[in-house]
A protein has these predicted regions:
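Short beta-strand-centered segments that line the small-molecule binding cleft or hinge
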Residues: 24-40, 45-53
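Short, small-residue-biased leader/transition segments that mark boundaries at the very start
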Residues: 1-12
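Alpha-helix C-terminal capping/helix-to-coil transition sites in glycosyltransferase folds
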Residues: 7-8, 22, 147
Length: 224
């Protein structure tokens, strides 16, 4: 039984854990956020031997149904009137910024995408209006509702939006880098042995064929 689930951007969840929120498992859409906890934090740590790179995802460029956009691929996003873009502190925003650098559309360091601001992107893309969104869900909603012409989301986030979103392009990993979802058990000062064992068992279950079939239904792929 899961008594509480922390939901939000990886940065917010990571910070809450660092500030003392009790958590037995951390499941992240970004490797960097897991790495920070792996290095230890006040009152807790990642349990050795429990970290697993569980899933892959893919970043997609999307538009709303019947938008009539002139954008036919990632290289043409400057043709849009505006774009919903996740904040540079969250993984999908970082993957998108890395892709822009690797595609030579924006100057910067692809290994430090958090340093690339919305204004940097707008200037490089002919003044493209950027709607900064707190997380990937906000991007999906902004585009699906027609508030923004295009946006970047995970492929998994298009599930349930089939009647509202069109995928313009699935970005190759050569641009974004691997989109990996790591999971690990956490141990804090108040973690009991039963809680730790349950966390390990749950992580093991998520690696079974039964669990993977559910993930694949929602557009995730299995990390080999």
């Amino acid at each position: 039984e899961i008594s509480e689930c922390l939901v939000g951007s990886e940065m917010c969840i990571r910070d809450r854990i660092k500030e003392g929120a009790k958590c037995n498992i951390f499941f992240s859409a970004g490797v960097a956020q897991m790495d920070e906890l792996q290095n230890g934090y006040d009152g807790g740590s990642v349990v050795d031997g429990t970290r697993v790179d569980l899933l892959n995802n893919q970043v997609c460029l999307v538009t709303y149904k019947n938008s009539g956009t002139a954008v036919t691929g990632f290289a043409e996003i400057s043709k849009a009137k505006n774009m919903a873009l996740a904040d540079r502190t969250v993984p999908v925003g970082q993957y998108t910024r890395a892709a822009l650098v690797n595609a030579k559309m924006v100057e910067g360091d692809a290994s430090n995408p958090q340093d690339i601001s919305d204004s940097d992107i707008s200037k490089a893309l002919d003044g493209l209006e950027i709607n900064s969104c707190a997380n990937v869900g906000a991007v999906a909603s902004a585009v699906a509702e027609g508030a923004n012409e295009i946006g970047t989301v995970y492929y998994s986030d298009t599930f349930g939006y089939e009647n509202q979103l069109d995928i313009i392009e699935k970005l190759p990993n050569s641009l974004t880098g691997d989109v990996i979802y790591p999971i690990a058990a956490l141990k804090g000062d108040s973690t009991t042995s039963d809680e730790l064992e349950a966390a390990k068992e749950f992580i093991a279950y998520l690696q079974t064929d039964e669990a993977m079939s559910v993930f694949e239904k929602y557009h995730f792929s299995v990390k080999e």
